[in-house]
Amino acid sequence: MESKKTVILDLTDCKYLGELHERIRVAFDFPEWYGANWDAFWDLLRSECDAEKLEIKGINTLSKEFDNQIETMKYVLEMFKNNCKKYDEIFEYEIIS
């Protein structure tokens, strides 16, 4: 049985939006030129992501100032998940903590 490729995104104690995007870039192994914004995240999910599962850790450690950013991230991930379904591809994400 083939195992799913899983990406683990650890946001524990992330303090700045730039740091959040750098952790995304590293977790997904996006290129250095990743634009560090939600449009760039969407673009690279569609073109560079071969993961079938994303586990997100550490959201509960973020300050309230990140609430809107996390909602935007979840929106982009949900769009990507739905886009994958159209092409019979699998992508799911789970917020662990």
Residue ranges of each PLM-predicted region?
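Positively charged, polar, low-complexity stretches
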Residues: E2-S97
